[in-house]
């Protein structure tokens, strides 16, 4: 039996805004992301469930960081149970879908492996375009004709959204770089152990062969004739 896990819907609290503008703050959080790293034992399958709103963009990226041949089976299903993505023996993948209202299921399957456990990293990015537009419209309710400001609320909203988008992209890139670094480090450590092991084996073989050669040469020059009395 596989293990099932529910992922909480990420929340962002904006405490620096006035209370009258909190309803428009939703325009600042169109993108929500989270990442997770776990170990999947050999012969096991683990599934995760993510509740999604209507007409959002869900991006799932996964990587096998360590274990065996760095491969895993991946399955993504819609709330109705329809298979959207099914991949076998993949080391990484990126998939984007336009979501419906409901719980999306994605599973990592390691049942084909009888020995090697896998260390798996995955990241979820949800871009809710509907809430972004609605939040921007809410901001306009608080703009009156008597407001004479050098920078309007629309400009503030645009600047904050631009900053947030750039920060989110930077965080996403840093997360991926950490995942790549972890996988490369695991590969290098595995190669290091293999090189050391075979180096020791070769050294032992060389010592044994050298000893045999010395013994053979020594035996060739020994005088085996018996002396007569």
From Swiss-Prot:
InterPro entries per record: Emp24-like, GOLD_dom, GOLD_dom_sf
Keyword match Oxidoreductase: no
Subcellular location: Endoplasmic reticulum membrane; Golgi apparatus, cis-Golgi network membrane; Endoplasmic reticulum-Golgi intermediate compartment membrane
Coiled-coil segments: none
SMART domains: EMP24_GP25L (SM01190)
Topological region Lumenal: 28-196
Gene Ontology CC terms: cis-Golgi network; COPII-coated ER to Golgi transport vesicle; endoplasmic reticulum; endoplasmic reticulum exit site; endoplasmic reticulum membrane; endoplasmic reticulum-Golgi intermediate compartment; endoplasmic reticulum-Golgi intermediate compartment membrane; Golgi apparatus
Cytoplasmic side, ranges: 218-229
Protein keywords: Endoplasmic reticulum, Golgi apparatus, Membrane, Protein transport, Signal, Transmembrane, Transmembrane helix, Transport
BP-aspect Gene Ontology terms: endoplasmic reticulum to Golgi vesicle-mediated transport; Golgi ribbon formation; intracellular protein transport
Membrane-related topology note: Single-pass type I membrane protein
Signal sequence, renumbered to the chain: 1-27
Domain GOLD: 45-126
UniProt key word Protein transport: yes
Cystines in this chain: none
Assembly, per entry: Interacts with TMED9 and TMED10.
Entry similarity comment: Belongs to the EMP24/GP25L family.
Record's function text: Potential role in vesicular protein trafficking, mainly in the early secretory pathway. Required for the maintenance of the Golgi apparatus; involved in protein exchange between Golgi stacks during assembly. Probably not required for COPI-vesicle-mediated retrograde transport.
Name of the protein this chain belongs to: Transmembrane emp24 domain-containing protein 5
Origin species: Rattus norvegicus
């Amino acid at each position: 039996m596989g293990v099932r896990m529910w992922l909480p819907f990420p929340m962002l609290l904006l405490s620096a805004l006035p209370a009258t503008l909190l309803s428009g703050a939703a325009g600042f959080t169109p993108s929500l992301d989270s990442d997770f790293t776990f170990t999947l034992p050999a012969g096991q399958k683990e599934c995760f469930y993510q509740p999604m709103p209507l007409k959002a963009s869900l991006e799932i990226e996964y990587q096998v960081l360590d274990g065996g041949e760095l491969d895993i089976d991946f399955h993504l299903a819609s709330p109705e149970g329809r298979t959207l993505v099914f991949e076998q023996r993949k080391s990484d993948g990126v998939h984007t879908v336009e979501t419906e209202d409901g719980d999306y299921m994605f599973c990592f399957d390691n049942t084909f492996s009888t020995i090697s456990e896998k260390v798996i990293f995955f990241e979820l990015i949800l871009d809710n375009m509907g809430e972004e537009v609605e939040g921007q419209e809410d901001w306009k309710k608080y703009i009156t004709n008597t407001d004479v400001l050098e920078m309007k609320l629309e400009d503030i909203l645009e600047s904050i959204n631009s900053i947030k988008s750039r920060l989110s992209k930077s965080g996403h890139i840093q997360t991926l770089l950490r995942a790549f670094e972890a996988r490369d480090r695991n590969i290098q450590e595995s190669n290091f152990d293999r090189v050391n092991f075979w180096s020791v084996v070769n050294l032992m073989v060389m010592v044994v062969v050298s000893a045999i050669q010395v013994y053979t040469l020594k035996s060739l020059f020994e005088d085996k004739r018996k002396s007569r009395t």
